């Protein structure tokens, strides 16, 4: 067997982590997370982070590697992921990269050449004080291609793109060349074609997160890091924070989270479907594991 990389990607709430665990057990493979929020300690329930039991059962990497006040750039993630993949290859292992952060996956699969601009804390503070609406408008002016790929409410990525532009004078979108890896890669995509069914799953998952103590998690993050923590403005956490501050009801917070998750899944679907190299599978197929396993066995390098 030639060491390579198995990628499991696709929209949120399609069972990517469960499939990765099942395959990792069969292959004796480590799992690398490709989730831009699971890298942060304390953001657990709302990011569907693998449980402690699952992490003890199968080695997971690139989870809980940063404090929420720290900045992990795509270049930082890429560097750490590439180092881990190289390490596993020397041990004869093929790791599994799983997640829904498209840029993280592209950084590895396509070998994106990403500008290594250190975080500019003073600049970030100045930009953040202007509010997300204003800074996103600035991004649309200075780097339209980057703005098209970044959601208008994604403050973390908006700040980073502006940071790169104001530090280097060159738009982030103009600095991303490619240097694809030489090892073989199998990309597996999971999706649910029945959007009503996918919505039901998102509703059930959101309700389960609340029952598991998501509100307590958000309150602890607010108490420890402050209400202005940028990560608390991300999907789900923003809505739960609004409820805790008595701005909306829990029913409204849950409904908004479900709606925004559906919208996020749509954007992920568009992103990943543009990649012709992905082998797609129906996440609701009862024979999913067998079908994916057959695909893996059909790869000459595995």
UniProtKB/Swiss-Prot annotation:
Residues 35-38 are annotated as: Interaction with substrate tRNA. Its EC number is 2.5.1.75. The keyword Transcription does not apply. It comes from the Bacteria. GO terms for biological process: tRNA modification. InterPro entries: Dimethylallyltransferase (IPR039657), IPT (IPR018022), P-loop_NTPase (IPR027417). Keywords: ATP-binding, Magnesium, Nucleotide-binding, Transferase, tRNA processing. It is an enzyme of class 2 (transferase). Substrate binds at residues 12-17. Its cofactor is Mg(2+). One of its GO terms (molecular function) is ATP binding. SUPFAM superfamilies: P-loop containing nucleoside triphosphate hydrolases (SSF52540). ATP binds at residues 10-17. Gene3D superfamilies: 1.10.20.140, P-loop containing nucleotide triphosphate hydrolases (3.40.50.300). Belongs to the IPP transferase family. Monomer. PANTHER family: TRNA DIMETHYLALLYLTRANSFERASE. HAMAP family: IPP_trans. This is tRNA dimethylallyltransferase. The gene is miaA.
